[in-house]
Amino acid sequence: MALTDLPITIGICAYNEAQIIERSIRSVYSQKLDGIVIDEVIVVSSGSTDGTDDIVKNLMSEYPNLRLIRQEKREGKNSAINCYLDSKKTEIVVMLNADNAFGTDESLQKLVEPLRADDVGITGGHPVPTNDPKDKVGFAVCLMWAMHHELAMIHPKIGELIAFKDIGTRLRTDMQSDEDMLRMKIEEAGMKCVYVGDSIILNRGPETLDDFIKQRVRVNVGECVMKKNFDYDIPTWNKKYLLKAMFASRKVVGFHPFKMLWVARLEMKCRKQAQEIADRGGDMPVWEQVKSTKKL
């Protein structure tokens, strides 16, 4: 690609995100861009009933290229992603969760820039949780995301924030996997994935143990289904990578061996439960919202 203005579309999936959607949208428009132009920000609200739609509509007068697409009933994230993929006009799409916000004003630029290369098809940002690591569950959240970052530096692992070239892939609505499915198809087309560690996206992890387990089981079910149905290996299941990532994560969370062991055992429990669900043919294309993650 030539070094000219690169048009992109921001896609945001929302379900009852009134508590955080405005901050997420404003974080997009606060980005400093050079040679990258946001054609549209498309919010797909899937069956929201809490005022999310009204908040987006009110912001549309301030941001003329902000667009709302409403799905009357909640159809799942993959359905919402397909909806904005079928509605956008640009090749490059940035996928942002409605309950996240950019952590720096250069994060979007850094995320998209690698896509100028012909051999790069998808990039992933660096999720940073706002949970308090002094709290027991907060420590688990911070450790998991610190390990995610360290592992991604070894072998790219993307999630929460991605940018990609649309090659025509549309997601199965009977599955929950989105980023991994898009990545698999892009890699099959001969392009590679790049992890952008300085493209920061803020998120909020669960605050209760029950919510943490619920979320980890769901995420792991999606990864187990990807392995079962497509024999696609997720790097976070590589034990060698995990050990290296846990050791390196001390830079962020400190060295707390007993807490780390507790988190490791908890994750093993969640993975075992997820594997059992996947083995029975289960998946979670529409999942119960984790309320404690909506306090960014």
Where are these regions (language model features)?
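Long helical/loop segments within the catalytic core of UDP-sugar-dependent glycosyltransferases
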Residues: 79, 111-168, 217-220
